[in-house]
Amino acid sequence: MSVTTQQPAVVPLPSSPRLPIESHAGPRSTQLPPSPPETVNGDDPKSITSTPAEPDFPLPPPANPKPQVLDIDKPTPDAHVPRDPRLIRLTGVHPFNTEPPLTDLYNEGFLTSPELFYVRNHGAVPEVQDEECLDWEFSIEGMVANPLKITLRQLLEEYENVTYPVTLVCAGNRRKEQNVVRKSKGFAWGAAGVSTALFTGVVMKDVIERAKPLRKAKYVCMEGADKLPNGYYGTSVKLNWVMDPNRGIMLAHKMNGENLSLDHGKPLRAVVPGQIGGRSVKWLKKLIVTAEPSDNWYHIYDNRVLPTMVDPDEAAKNPKWWMDERYAIYDLSPNSAIAFPAHEEKVVLASAENSYNVRGYAYSGGGRRITRCEVSLNKGKNWRLANIDYAEDKYRDFEGRELFGARLDMDWRETSFCWCFWNLDIATAELRDANDILVRAMDEAMCIQPRDMYWSVLGMMNNPWYRITIHHEGDVLRFEHPTQPALIPGGWMERVKKAGGNLTNGQWGEQIEGQELENTAVEEVKEIKMTKDGVNRIVELDELKWHESAEYPWFVVNDEVYDGTSFLEGHPGGAQSIISAAGLDASDEFMAIHSETAKAMMPAYHIGTLSPTASKQLSLEEPTSKQASSSSLRPTFLDSRTWSKALLSSKTKVSWDTRIFRFKLDHASQTLGLPTGQHLMIRLRDPVTREAIIRSYTPISQISEQGFCDVLIKIYADAPGREGGKMTKALDSIPCGHWVDMKGPIGKFEYLGKGVCSINGNERRVRSMKMICGGSGITPIYQVLRAILQDSADSTHCTVLNGNRLEEDILCREDLDRFAEENGERCTLVHTLTQAAEGWTGRRGRIGEELLKEFCGTEEDGLVLVCGPEGLERSVKGLLSGMAWRDDDVIFF
């Protein structure tokens, strides 16, 4: 197959020596105010309209030393990805979501190196070897007359390749400001979630044309290779945008002249200029032409600006908000930020220059040019024009030139795909008399940044005026930006909010002249106090580690230190739950699993606060193990103190709402290491908020099985008026081949065999067990029952009361019925249904007083095991107490 596109003769640009890159960070000549701005002055030798004899457009920054795989990434699924340590991690260690320091980003100039380019990853980075890249294949399917499968090799050989600069921006850029006002569902981006590169590839229009879209096709859905909790990442754009050459939507394989790096989509990604970065799918595997927008989970539940009155609870309860395509984000809005003065930068007046060059960036979307940037020193009462450097326009002067092995495709374009840099000299004396510096930008659609924030539940597209404050400290001016990214403290917004200022009062939380200070919190957060008043002890890491033992276990939740010693006996999950957390940060597990009641108990065990140094050291010690290497094969998989990675290898449908999930362990001869009657924890992360979802499960596979474990899980889907289960929905949506974290064992009960069990470490002999369960609560009951009945020498008698709604809801029924049939003298099995069909011959109704009195009378050396929905457990507890069962004889899983 060949391409016969008519093109001008290509004249390669010189590749060596590298052309100098114009600095955008240096001082400018003083013009107060410039009118018109210098960038539209045709006589300026730097003017965009000049036609130089030699290329003078920006080329990539000088290459940095090749990054290495960082120690912090080695225990994660991204252990194969080299990274720059300067990047600021926004979601902890993994997944990798980062932005560079704002000053470093600006100082690199118009083009950003791949090492400093911001990264948004929803999960693990696909592992692609260099030798596999040319054979990387993606499909074009759906509403097309000619479905195609194309390799990267074919893109290089059979299609015209082009190069042009594009700025990519995360829709969450500047979200931290929204999170300070009111917590959104998104993590805390600063103002550096934006970067620019020269991308090389094939215009998507060329490949879609060959597939011949059908008449009613309207969208192009894209899907990547990154496996996530809710399926592969995917989204869509309109087909007519793809087919519009002015939009410049590209299938890119190079970035700044180098093959894409792993974090940036190696070996192939979409690049959608002028739109949020979430539309530029990385690790591209599918283009699907459709009549409707994408139904991918990430297209629907991410990258939306819901109406400001929709709070997180309403958004969670009503899926209709997410389904409305009007709220989906595509084109970027005008935005700008100040890079210099930097946060906490100081100017000593006695030795300062006469003027300071205030400077930063601005961008807009949809191909629209930023037409003005304005700066104010008096809270927006007066504005002055800043100079603007449109470095992107310098590429337009070169027709028929080659750059990075492809045609530089800019000479005919009138759209603007890139950011611009603005600057303005301000007299130092004026800064001395001012309290803040504001900047705002306007694009050619006359759309201007607003003064006030538009808060939304995902915190996206935040673009109010960017403001830095000026503190007068004697002879020194100190500058303060609004926030710092991630969990880094600092910024005037946090300071004002802590002082009681209302950040939405139209004056950035400051007192309005003539009015009393408004001391009203924007949002009343119902937060349970988990610390004890008067406890000021600072705990260092060494002291915490002295208490890793089972005898005196200390643990950490949100940087606060707790002594669990006195609760070892009373913990509902058993002493092991506390011992396993000893000396560790248990924040994820504790916050995800425990109720408000449990949180309210915490002040009684609070003994101190981690020092900042200890907190940082502990965060770097996240004990997560990947699958074992062949040189260190562990005989058992589970570790009570370490999260281990298990691979989802298959899903087996048991009923309409129940699946058996098979997880592959490290190696074929490895056992799970879970005692009978105990549980393991499974951890996934919410793809939007990155908060940990952790739940306890009991596998149904034999404890002696090697190489895998099977977990039976009932899926609680969303229903009208009821939100489904976070974890079960996430597990149901992840594809085979996805990793999950596991930790264990946990639980206070263990069956040792032949009537002997251990409760909180104390052995006890029993002659009978009453097992009461409902729904998926059968799993721990099933595990103990099977262990007893498989041992012919075990004389323990078991009575099982199993409650369900419908006959098809009875889980493990075949095995349960077989156990009862083959062991009639040792096992009594009673099924009861609340919505039984007409032909049902078993019991009807809930497990109530009648059944309990008939089958669960008190016995010497008897024990009751209960597992089921909260309502069942609460009811059974009260009824058993009324039947004279002692609390010590009733175990709730």
UniProtKB/Swiss-Prot annotation:
Superkingdom, natural source: Eukaryota
InterPro entries referenced in this protein's UniProt entry, alphabetically: Cbr1-like_FAD-bd_dom, Cyt_B5-like_heme/steroid-bd, Cyt_B5-like_heme/steroid_sf, Cyt_B5_heme-BS, FAD-bd_FR_type, Flavoprot_Pyr_Nucl_cyt_Rdtase, FNR_nucleotide-bd, Ig_E-set
UniProt-annotated binding residues for NADP(+): L863, V864, L865, V866, C867, G868, P869, E870, G871, L872
EC number(s) per entry: 1.7.1.3
Membrane-spanning segments: none
Keyword Protein transport belongs to the record: no
GO MF annotation list: FAD binding; heme binding; molybdenum ion binding; molybdopterin cofactor binding; nitrate reductase (NADPH) activity; sulfite oxidase activity
Compositional bias of kind Basic and acidic residues: 71-83
Region (Disordered): 1-83
Example of a GO biological process term: nitrate assimilation
Reported function: Nitrate reductase is a key enzyme involved in the first step of nitrate assimilation in plants, fungi and bacteria.
Name the UniProt record assigns to this protein: Nitrate reductase [NADPH]
Native species: Leptosphaeria maculans
